[in-house]
């Protein structure tokens, strides 16, 4: 029986060795989880089909969802810097992403949701396979805790809701219902936030999450690949999906304000840029303080915010070019201030990316993990290969005996310094990694890297 670690206050999610098989409660939970996985996969498939068909002019959709605003038409609505006055009788277009950017972001979101559905299907197949095999004898009732480590029931419900709402947004934008589509997108974003956070943390503490993964790796290593490294990849993709949704949300709020209140053109731009910066900073802080405890190598959020900032900067530049006269009258410094703020946001995302990578390396180096050992091995091999390729180019002429002997000594010392030094695991890591002192590990104390 696995003993409780000093840092874990809860009982392990995975039960210890005992009765073999699945009880009635676990059976109901397993079938319900399968139905939810099927519904999520079906919803993502329908979303992908809807997105593809809405992109083709031959399918019968009245409009293209990506062309939400048109800056080419002459504006007749601005009189003394005020929108929608009865004297003018027109509507000025609001700031929004360019067509290619919006289409790319929606396709990325859809493909990530499809990838998560494939991840869940593969995990369900593996769970069913090992639940009926001899491997299940090591963990009593392994179906229920393993599915909880893949995705909880609440996570699947939130994911299905977010996917369906995104499909509704695409249909509304295809019929040019911009305000209603923007309102639905706000609800979609809220559900997407809860889905990504629930998928990342599984509703448990980070210490308990790590303990469950260690127990799962000991008893069911095949499923550990899905619950451990597989979830890390899906978490990076999911957080990236959430990051690129930030500019769309901020601009959707601008559309709602512009079509609901009597405001000027510069105010909608200010609201959109301000909301994006505020949500972007909050997103990066939450990822660094909370999500990074579950997945340490987490580069998706910072990269997503960087891409989102660049895309929003391009959109604002194009907007100010088309409406330079009106913006210069209402707010002369708006263009410069908006570009500077978005640029600062991009720089902050780069800084947070570097901070996350440094902290991840320090974490794995301190614990002498397999990940850090493999990274050192790959980097040393790449450096030796680069030196081998560049060596003949730096010394095209034959060397004398002294120079040859000096180069050989330097090469030997460099090679010795680059050999991985993390093959032997420290006693502290052995105590932390293996909770059961009576279990004899199959491996020796020296790690093997493939």
UniProtKB/Swiss-Prot annotation:
Residue ranges that the UniProt entry lists as topological domain Virion surface: 53-101, 175-178, 258-270, 316-334
Protein family (similarity comment): Belongs to the herpesviridae glycoprotein M family.
One term under GO cellular component: virion membrane
Functional summary from the UniProt entry: Envelope glycoprotein important for virion assembly and egress. Plays a role in the correct incorporation of gH-gL into virion membrane. Directs the glycoprotein N (gN) to the host trans-Golgi network.
Record bears the keyword Transmembrane: yes
Predominant subcellular localization, coarse grouping: virion
Protein name as catalogued: Envelope glycoprotein M
Membrane topology, Intravirion segments: 1-31, 123-153, 200-236, 292-294, 356-450
The protein's assembly and partners: Interacts (via N-terminus) with gN (via N-terminus). The gM-gN heterodimer forms the gCII complex.
Membrane topology: Multi-pass membrane protein
Transmembrane regions: 32-52, 102-122, 154-174, 179-199, 237-257, 271-291, 295-315, 335-355
């Amino acid at each position: 029986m696995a003993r409780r670690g000093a840092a874990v206050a809860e009982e392990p999610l995975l039960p210890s060795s005992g009765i073999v098989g699945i009880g009635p409660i676990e059976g109901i939970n397993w079938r319900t989880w399968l139905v939810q996985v099927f519904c999520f996969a079906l919803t993502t498939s329908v979303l992908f089909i809807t997105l593809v068909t809405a992109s083709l002019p031959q399918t019968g959709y009245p409009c293209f969802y990506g062309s939400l605003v048109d800056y080419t038409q002459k504006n007749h609505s601005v009189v003394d810097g005020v929108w929608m006055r009865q004297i003018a009788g027109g509507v000025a277009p609001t700031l929004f992403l360019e067509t290619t950017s919006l289409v790319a972001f929606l396709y990325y979101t859809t493909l990530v949701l499809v990838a998560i559905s494939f991840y869940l299907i593969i995990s369900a197949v593996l769970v069913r396979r090992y639940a009926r095999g001899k491997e299940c004898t090591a963990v009593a009732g392994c179906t229920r805790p393993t599915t909880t480590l893949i995705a909880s029931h609440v996570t699947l419900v939130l994911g299905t809701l977010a996917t369906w709402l995104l499909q509704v947004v695409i249909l509304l934008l295809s019929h040019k219902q911009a305000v209603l589509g923007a309102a639905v997108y706000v609800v979609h974003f809220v559900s997407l936030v809860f889905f990504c956070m629930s998928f990342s943390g599984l509703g448990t503490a980070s210490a308990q999450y790590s303990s469950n993964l260690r127990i799962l790796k000991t008893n069911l290593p095949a499923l550990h690949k899905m619950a451990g490294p597989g979830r890390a990849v899906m978490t990076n993709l999911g957080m990236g999906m959430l990051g690129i949704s930030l500019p769309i949300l901020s601009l959707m709020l601008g559309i709602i304000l512009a079509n609901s209140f009597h405001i000027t053109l510069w105010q909608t731009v200010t609201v959109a840029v301000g909301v994006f910066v505020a949500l972007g900073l909050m997103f990066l802080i939450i990822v660094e303080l909370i999500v990074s405890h579950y997945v340490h190598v987490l580069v998706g959020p910072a990269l997503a915010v960087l891409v989102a900032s660049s895309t929003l900067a391009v959109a604002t530049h194009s907007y100010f070019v088309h409406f330079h006269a009106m913006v210069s009258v209402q707010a002369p410094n708006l263009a410069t201030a908006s570009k500077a703020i978005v640029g600062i946001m991009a720089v902050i995302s780069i800084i947070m990316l570097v901070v996350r990578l440094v902290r991840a390396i320090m974490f794995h180096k301190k614990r002498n993990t397999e990940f850090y050992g493999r990274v050192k091995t790959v980097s040393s091999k790449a450096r030796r290969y680069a030196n081998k390729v560049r060596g003949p180019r730096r010394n095209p002429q034959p060397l004398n005996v002294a120079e040859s002997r000096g180069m050989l000594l330097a090469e030997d010392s460099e090679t010795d310094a680059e050999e991985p030094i993390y093959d032997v695991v420290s006693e502290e890591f052995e105590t932390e990694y293996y909770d059961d002192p009576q279990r004899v590990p199959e491996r020796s104390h020296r790690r093997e890297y493939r």
